[in-house]
């Protein structure tokens, strides 16, 4: 099996001096290409921090983080930003859409940054794929929560990433919209063979993944 992510003896500490907290302690983990993995655990267990490290948004204090064969811990900020733009898509609980941009413009932003030859054409394709062809020119404030998360998903998938990270993607949605987003997320992932790492408190959602990893107090439970 091809390894999408390999983590070796990962340690992460947050805070300063007396208030420092050991969030992750000696994590060892391998995720294979095309696999869907759910990260579960109580609040404060370290699952979101682990996702952020794998996505290149949080630094490791110690250890190695190999993503698509590249060592995040050896990259400078510019190299890491380029790598994220090419290989990684992220969907958060909060939609993080730019309020002054339309749905189409929001999805086109990462494509423009990556110098895609047709960012708006590609963005329109992705919005069509998530069922928002009729909302291209609407601003976030004109969209429902479910529609905003669809825009966020389209934005994450537009660069055709090899890895998709989702941190509580249904946390701000009602049950019906949450289920629709999950169905769409898994359908797109399956269609494109994208590696998925999903943080969730929902055991039913985690069960849809190929494998579930439980964290407790910064450790992976055996």
Regions found by a protein language model. Give the residues of each.
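ABC family nucleotide-binding domain
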Residues: 4-5, 10-208, 212-215
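C-terminal segments of enzyme domains that contribute to small-molecule binding surfaces
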Residues: 190, 221-222
């Amino acid at each position: 099996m091809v390894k999408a992510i390999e983590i070796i003896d990962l340690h992460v500490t947050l805070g300063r001096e007396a208030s420092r907290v050991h969030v992750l302690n000696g994590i060892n983990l391998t995720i294979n290409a095309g696999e869907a993995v759910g990260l579960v655990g109580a609040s404060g267990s370290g699952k979101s921090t682990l996702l952020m490290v794998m996505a290149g948004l949080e630094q490791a204090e110690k250890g190695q983080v190999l993503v698509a064969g590249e060592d995040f811990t050896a990259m400078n900020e510019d190299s890491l930003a380029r790598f994220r733009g090419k290989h990684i898509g992220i969907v958060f609980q909060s939609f993080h859409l730019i309020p002054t941009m339309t749905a189409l413009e929001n999805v086109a932003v990462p494509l423009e940054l990556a110098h895609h030859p047709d960012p708006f054409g590609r963005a329109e394709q992705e919005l069509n794929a998530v069922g928002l062809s009729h909302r291209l020119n609407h601003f976030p404030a004109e969209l429902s929560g479910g529609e905003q998360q669809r825009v966020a998903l389209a934005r994450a998938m537009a660069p055709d990433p090899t890895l998709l990270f989702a941190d509580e993607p249904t946390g701000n949605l009602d049950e019906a919209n949450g289920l629709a987003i999950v169905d769409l997320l898994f359908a797109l992932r399956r269609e494109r063979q994208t590696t998925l790492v999903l943080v969730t408190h929902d055991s039913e959602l985690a069960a849809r993944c190929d494998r579930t990893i439980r964290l407790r107090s910064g450790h992976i439970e055996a």
